[in-house]
A protein has these predicted regions:
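AMP-binding/adenylate-forming
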Residues: 93-103, 150-166, 171-233, 245, ...
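Conserved AMP-binding A3 loop
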Residues: 30-31, 134-161
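Conserved AMP-binding/adenylate-forming
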Residues: 43-83, 174-182
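Gly/Ser/Thr-rich phosphate-binding loop
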Residues: 235-289
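Conserved pre-ATP/AMP-binding loop-to-beta segment of ANL
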Residues: 5, 15-17, 115-138, 169-176
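Conserved ATP-binding/catalytic segment of the ANL
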Residues: 302-336
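Conserved AMP-binding/adenylate-forming core of the ANL superfamily
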Residues: 8-9, 17-47, 151-154
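Conserved ATP-binding loop and adjacent catalytic segment of the adenylate-forming AMP-binding
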Residues: 204, 266-306, 316-320
Length: 336
């Protein structure tokens, strides 16, 4: 799929029901099953008065069910950044109820989401998702107080388009595995939105250890979504899995860890620079230690005294956002 599907068309676009969406161990979820599961949850959510629903999931397929059902039902998905019961109870004013794949012991509304192992005999497209709909994410911020970040669906779609234009050919035929959670924007974008937009099957569980990565079946080629925290713990003594492409974000990737990764997987990592507030800003194919960052198309940096302001198609505010990082630009617009 060269043209990424916008989120509102993940279900409604004319595609075969047997299109694989996600897998876990020996089980595969298809588009037909996703359509069935989302339709059931949409019907349930329409009967609820609450507008804002927190998504707390370990299974990425069921996360997608909840995300799509919330939006198609006209609700607002809230991603609190965790699934800890004590914190959810403290944050209850932020949402009307909780959608989860587990029976959480919390006060208030809880809907446990499951897959019914069924498809719909005759698919009736769900109501369109209004382009003004959005997802709310909460980050801890520097003070530890939850900070609300709004991500409009149109911005998520534009982000998928930028990534498809940059990496699309290399992603063809890949299955997506990840060591990051969809409870943060990086995981939401790369583990959920990108594979769904590109029609790439995704692994429904998170990889916590290098041993899990090494144990992946060799009948697939993988796009591995990871972070410096995971890559520094790789064990080169393990058998290397067939990873075709590696993306890292969430911090600086030390050169020694790049070298270890290349020695094991025989591929150079692609790094992403950005933040929850800004979305993706720049990338680099890390074949050298001090390689500069290259901005994505439409991303513009503006120097303001000692600070830097950025505008981009992904930033809703017309005036852009100010960055905390100190960036040094060369004559070609690349930076370090």
């Amino acid at each position: 799929m060269n043209n990424p599907l916008p989120l509102g068309q993940w279900l409604n676009a004319p595609r075969p029901d047997d299109t694989p969406v996600a897998w876990l161990d020996d089980r595969t979820w298809t588009l037909g099953q996703l359509r069935h599961d989302v339709t059931l949850l949409v019907d349930t959510l329409r009967q609820q008065e609450g507008e804002r629903w927190a998504l707390c999931f370990e299974n990425s397929y069921l996360f997608i069910v909840a995300l799509l059902a919330s939006l198609h039902a006209g609700k607002t998905p809230v991603i609190p950044g965790h699934s800890r019961v004590s914190l959810l109870e403290e944050q209850q004013p932020l949402f009307s109820g909780v959608l989860s794949d587990r029976s959480l012991d919390i006060d208030g509304q809880l809907i446990v989401v499951a897959s019914r192992h069924q498809t719909i005999a005759r698919w009736v497209p769900l109501p369109e998702i209004n382009e003004n709909r959005f997802v709310e994410l909460f980050t801890s911020g520097s003070t530890g107080t939850p900070r609300r970040v709004v991500k409009y669906i149109v911005s998520l779609d534009r982000e998928a388009r930028l990534l498809a234009d940059r990496f699309g050919e290399r992603l063809a035929g890949c299955s997506v595995v990840a060591s990051v959670v969809p409870q943060h924007l990086y995981g939401l974008t790369f583990r959920i939105v990108l594979p769904m937009a590109m029609g790439l099957p995704l692994h429904a569980a998170m990889l916590y250890y290098a041993e899990q990565l090494a144990a992946l079946p060799h009948d697939r080629h993988y796009l591995f979504i990871s972070s410096p925290a995971f890559l520094k713990r790789l064990d080169a003594e393990l058998a290397a899995p067939p990873v075709r492409m590696l993306i890292s974000a969430g911090g600086m990737l030390p050169w020694r860890d790049v070298s270890t990764t290349v020695g094991w997987l025989n591929i150079w990592p692609d790094e992403i620079y950005g933040s929850t507030e800004t979305g993706i800003l720049a990338w680099r194919h890390r074949v050298e230690d001090n390689l500069p960052w290259r901005p994505f198309p439409g991303v513009n940096f503006h120097q303001e005294d000692d600070a830097c302001r950025v505008t981009s198609p992904l930033i809703h505010e017309a005036e852009g956002l100010q960055l905390d990082d100190i960036l040094h630009f060369d004559s070609e617009g690349l930076f370090s």
